Structures are given as C-alpha cells and as structure tokens.
C-alpha cells in the first residue's frame, strides 16, 4: 500500500535526521581516515553512501591527536566497528618537510617555538622549532617514503592505541588518483600483472 511506503520513508528520514539522539550508528558502522585532497573520492571508491560512514579528513590522512579523538568517540560511543585508513598517490605531504615549512613561517616573523596549538588547552604549546616540524607530520619526517608506508603506519598506530577498542577492524588502502581505484599498500596492479607474466605466483 502507498501509505505503508510513505510511513516507511517518513521513519527513514526521521531516523537519519535524529540518529545521534536515537543512538543509531552510521549504516556501515564505519569510520574513515583520509586526506583532504579533493581528488580522493572516498564514497565512490568504496561504493558507499553519505549515511554509511563517518569520514575524517586532514592533510595527508595522518593520525593526529584530533584524529584519535574522533576515532575514539565514534568507536566507543557511536557504534563504529570498522576503521579504514586511505592515503593516496601524488600527495603533497610527501613533497615537503617540516623544516621547510618552519623556515617559511619563521621568515614571516612567526614564532613557531611559542605556538599555542589548541585554544581550549592553553597548556598545549609547541616549545621548539623541532616540535613545530614534528607537529606538521610530513611523510618524510615520519620516516615514510610513500603513501603506502603512511597508510600502514596509520593503521598500526590506531590498532595499538588504548582509546581504540581491540575488537575494531582496521584496514589500510591507497587511493590512486590516476585510476580512481583503491589498492592495498605496496601492491600496484601493474606490478602484480608483471609478476604473473614472468611466472611468479603472488601469495598473500
């Protein structure tokens, strides 16, 4: 009956609008950490809808203190059971270092060794130029040479963090801006194809 369909749609819209008040988790119980780069089309790559996941973006898709804050809230209080970390190719965070950025701001007269990093927590201050360079978390400063390395490092940090429940599934992927597809870290499709062509069987 039409009335049943209308009633169902009304309830669906109500649940969507009031899901936090009703304690309803996102549809896939999923939290995604990825880069703010507009070329990373997360929903398309994963085949999900906006209501399926909480998506957290920052420069580089890096695990930061605020990323951990958000991840801990969604997994402990919003019913999230899975975390997916997505970095991407051609990321600007691999092109620079914290030292280069520190010099840029120092040349502008900014005292990078005296910065208050959280307006609500005045005691949290960067007390040296070295602190400032580490705070930006450029890939090379983290000992990573590729988005693949960062994806794996991010996943490992989250898996071992005391604020993230141990029963949460955590996975890492790399989004290729050239193909708009996801792949596992260090497993480029053309490399796998080349191994098969040369008679090498790939085992996971």
UniProtKB/Swiss-Prot annotation:
EC number(s) from the headed UniProt entry: 3.13.1.5
Q: What biological process terms from GO does the record include?
A: hydrogen sulfide biosynthetic process
Q: How is the cofactor bound?
A: Binds 1 zinc ion per subunit.
Q: Which UniProt keywords apply?
A: Hydrolase, Metal-binding, Zinc
Question: Looking at the record's lineage, which domain of life comes first?
Answer: Archaea
**What are the names of the required cofactors?**
Zn(2+)
Which GO terms of the molecular function aspect are on file? carbonate dehydratase activity; hydrolase activity; zinc ion binding
> What residues does Zn(2+) bind to?
35, 88, 91
Task: State the top-level EC class.
Answer: hydrolase
Q: Which Pfam families does the entry link to? A: Pro_CA (PF00484)
Does Glycoprotein count among this protein's keywords?
Answer: no
**Residues that span the membrane, as ranges:** none
Instruction: Describe which pathway this protein belongs to, using the record's wording.
Output: Sulfur metabolism; hydrogen sulfide biosynthesis
Catalytic reactions on record: carbon disulfide + 2 H2O = 2 hydrogen sulfide + CO2 + 2 H(+)
Role this protein plays: Catalyzes the conversion of carbon disulfide into hydrogen sulfide and carbon dioxide, with carbonyl sulfide as an intermediate. Likely plays a key role in sulfur metabolism in S.solfataricus. Does not show carbonic anhydrase activity (hydration of CO(2) to carbonate).
Q: Which family does it belong to?
A: Belongs to the beta-class carbonic anhydrase family.
Q: How does it assemble?
A: Forms a hexadecameric catenane homooligomer, through interactions of two interlocked octameric rings.
Recorded protein name is Carbon disulfide hydrolase
Q: Which organism is it from?
A: Saccharolobus solfataricus (strain ATCC 35092 / DSM 1617 / JCM 11322 / P2)
Per the UniProt record, the lineage of the source organism begins with:
Archaea, Thermoproteota, Thermoprotei, Sulfolobales, Sulfolobaceae
């Amino acid at each position: 009956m039409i009335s049943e369909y209308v009633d169902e749609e009304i309830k669906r819209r109500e649940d969507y609008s009031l899901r936090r008040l009703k304690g309803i988790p996102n549809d896939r119980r999923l939290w995604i950490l990825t880069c703010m780069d507009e070329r990373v089309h997360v929903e398309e790559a994963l085949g999900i809808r906006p209501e399926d996941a909480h998506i957290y973006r920052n420069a580089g898709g890096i695990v930061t203190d605020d990323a951990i804050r958000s991840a801990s809230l969604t997994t402990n209080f919003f019913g999230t059971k899975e975390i997916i970390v997505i970095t991407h190719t051609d990321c600007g965070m691999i092109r620079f270092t914290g030292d280069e950025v520190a010099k840029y701001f120092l040349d502008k007269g900014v005292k990078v060794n005296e910065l208050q990093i959280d307006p609500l927590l005045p005691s949290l201050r960067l007390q040296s130029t070295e602190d400032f360079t580490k705070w930006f978390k450029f890939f090379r400063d983290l000992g990573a040479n590729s988005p693949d390395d960062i994806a794996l490092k991010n996943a490992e940090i989250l898996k071992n963090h005391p604020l993230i429940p141990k029963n949460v599934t955590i996975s890492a992927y790399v989004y290729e801006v050239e193909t708009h597809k996801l792949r596992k870290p260090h497993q480029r499709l053309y490399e796998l194809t080349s191994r098969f062509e040369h008679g090498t069987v790939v085992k996971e």
